């Protein structure tokens, strides 16, 4: 005879088993997707590497929007420009948050990294601050930094052309440290540079690990003690290293502001805003540190992609050089030439389409239930923008893996302008919606100046195999597989276009040297930079 208590336990067990059986299943009103397995859903089908290839295949199979069931979570993948614009841009209030990221945000970042922060009050405050310190007016004031570092990069290419990837990393990092903290990074071997990128690389290894993913898909795993989860232990250690580095940079800028040696930079602006908004030193340090990591890696990666593209498609460089020679002659291009160099401008846009860096974008999250194309998108769903699929849609971009700037010759808009209009977007390399990169103004200027000056000064040719004497064709499919995707190291033969241009590069750097001290830092505030008369921050 079954007692009442036994009956209750039996019902509870049946209910628990029923709920467990639902994990991994795709509800009928969700967007379509690949077949699932109980508990796992589609977890077993997510590749460890080159995920963009599989995600593009699913896009061709399932259409503009599909869903992946990942344990207890659901991911909605957007595969067309229309889908991204409709949901992430037009319905931005719903899709401005981020999914849970226990290791990346809660553990490594102590909840302070803006990139992964939920769209709560802190994120909204920081977004407003970022607009004030990274807007188009402010972007124009940093042109002296961009001018200096592109000239230094030309000298580096002239002296050690085989190390061109290192030169672009140093350029990108130095530009970012100047704009963020007010100091130049004069060598890629700077210990501050090395520590920052060591932390970034080690963090990504943890964030991309299967264990980290499982703790997001099955949150109960987070309660496992640290001694049984090495990922958690290492993440906490990385947080201590990271916050120490970021605070050191921030407090050093504060000290320089107090003694009158600081240069205009984001952190000086932050100190003024910190007095107005009363946010913590740790948050301020993470804002600066996050800008450092993001800006340093992305610009360099895009430039590496451009060099690979013109090595594979040399006719592009020839056309661009003819345009530059006609407009600029024997002088270096500058930002005043933007309206007169439409093909070079198109090269910048095509680079961002051809090698966007974040091939699957950065994930957003829905904050309430929504409906699109008749499918339900549930609250807290992860929203993934399949940038690779959009950028390689043959209906919009015929022969998409051909690097062809002519696609953009009739695009008169800057990326920022196109992102805010009803016209076709140039690309989604800077993201979309309310999470779009707010450094877009600075990035597009850095890329134009770098690309135009490199093309003015140098020819980029395929390297020759010393044994076979045949040209080496870089593989456009040989990509790094980290947080930010770029071509893996490849050889190229980089030579000055003429002795006169090589001499001019040296002369331009000689003029810059007069502005630098013995440590190769700015002697005074560069001419043209707006210095706000901030009182020293205690």
Curated annotation (Swiss-Prot):
GO terms for cellular component: membrane. Its cofactor is heme. Belongs to the cytochrome P450 family. It is a single-pass membrane protein. Heme binds at residue 437. Disruption phenotype: Leads to the accumulation of the 2-alkyl salicyl alcohols. SUPFAM superfamilies: Cytochrome P450. The PKS fogA releases the carboxylic acid (8E,10E,12E)-3,5,7-trihydroxytetradeca-8,10,12-trienoic acid as its product, as well as derivatives with one and two double bonds. It comes from the Eukaryota. It is an enzyme of class 1 (oxidoreductase). CDD domains: CYP64-like (cd11065). GO terms for molecular function: heme binding; iron ion binding; monooxygenase activity; oxidoreductase activity, acting on paired donors, with incorporation or reduction of molecular oxygen. Pfam families: p450. It comes from Aspergillus ruber (strain CBS 135680). The gene is fogE. This is Cytochrome P450 monooxygenase fogE. Pathway: Secondary metabolite biosynthesis. Keywords: Heme, Iron, Membrane, Metal-binding, Monooxygenase, Oxidoreductase, Transmembrane, Transmembrane helix. Its EC number is 1.-.-.-. The chain crosses the membrane at residues 4-24. PANTHER family: CYTOCHROME P450 MONOOXYGENASE ALNH-RELATED, P450, PUTATIVE (EUROFUNG)-RELATED-RELATED. It is found in: Membrane.
């Amino acid at each position: 005879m079954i007692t009442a208590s036994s009956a209750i336990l039996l019902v509870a067990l049946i209910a628990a088993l029923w709920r467990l059986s639902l994990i991994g299943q795709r509800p009928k009103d969700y967007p379509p997707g690949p077949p699932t397995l109980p508990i796992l859903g589609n977890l077993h089908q997510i590749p460890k590497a080159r995920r963009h290839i599989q995600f593009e295949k699913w896009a061709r199979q399932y259409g503009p929007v599909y869903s992946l069931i990942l344990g207890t979570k659901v991911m909605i993948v957007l595969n067309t420009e229309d889908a991204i614009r409709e949901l992430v841009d037009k319905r931005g209030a719903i899709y401005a948050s981020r999914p849970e990221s226990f290791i990346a945000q809660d553990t490594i970042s102590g909840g302070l990294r803006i990139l992964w922060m939920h769209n709560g009050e802190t994120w909204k405050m920081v977004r407003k601050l970022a607009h004030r310190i990274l807007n188009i007016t402010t972007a124009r004031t940093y042109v002296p930094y961009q001018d200096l570092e592109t000239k230094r990069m030309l000298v580096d290419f002239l002296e050690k052309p085989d190390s061109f990837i290192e030169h672009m990393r140093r350029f990108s990092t130095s530009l970012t440290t100047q704009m963020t903290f007010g100091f130049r990074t004069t060598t890629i071997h700077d210990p501050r540079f090395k520590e920052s990128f060591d932390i970034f690389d080690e963090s990504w290894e943890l964030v991309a690990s299967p264990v980290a993913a499982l703790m997001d898909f099955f949150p109960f795993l987070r309660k496992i003690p640290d001694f049984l989860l090495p990922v958690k232990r290492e993440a906490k250690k990385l947080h201590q290293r990271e916050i120490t580095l970021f605070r050191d940079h921030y407090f050093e800028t504060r000290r320089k502001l107090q003694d009158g040696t600081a240069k205009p930079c984001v952190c000086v602006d932050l100190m003024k805003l910190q007095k107005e908004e009363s946010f913590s030193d740790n948050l301020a340090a993470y804002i600066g540190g996050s800008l450092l990591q993001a800006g340093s890696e992305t610009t360099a990666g895009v430039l590496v992609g451009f060099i690979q593209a013109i090595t594979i498609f040399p006719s592009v460089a020839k056309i661009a050089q003819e345009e530059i020679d006609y407009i600029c002659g024997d002088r270096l291009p500058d930002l005043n030439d933007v309206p007169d160099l439409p093909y070079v401008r198109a090269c910048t846009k095509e680079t961002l389409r051809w090698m966007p860096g974040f091939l699957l974008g950065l994930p957003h999250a829905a904050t309430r239930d929504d409906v699109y194309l008749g499918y339900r998108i549930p609250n807290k769903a992860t929203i993934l923008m399949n940038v690779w699929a959009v950028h390689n849609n043959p209906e919009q971009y015929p022969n998409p893996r051909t690097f062809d700037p002519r696609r953009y010759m009739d695009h008169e808009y800057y990326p920022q302008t196109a992102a805010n209009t009803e016209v076709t977007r140039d690309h989604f390399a800077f993201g979309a919606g309310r999470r779009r990169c707010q450094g877009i103004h600075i990035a597009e200027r850095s890329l134009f100046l770098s690309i135009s000056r490199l093309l003015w000064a140098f020819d980029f040719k395929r390297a020759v195999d010393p044994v076979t004497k045949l040209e080496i064709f870089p593989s456009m499919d040989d990509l790094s597989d980290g947080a930010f995707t770029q071509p893996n190291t490849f050889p190229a033969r980089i030579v000055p276009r003429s002795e006169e241009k090589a001499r001019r590069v040296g002369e331009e750097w000689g003029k810059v040297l007069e502005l630098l001290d013995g440590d190769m830092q700015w002697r005074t505030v560069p001419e043209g930079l707006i210095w706000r008369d901030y009182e020293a921050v205690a």
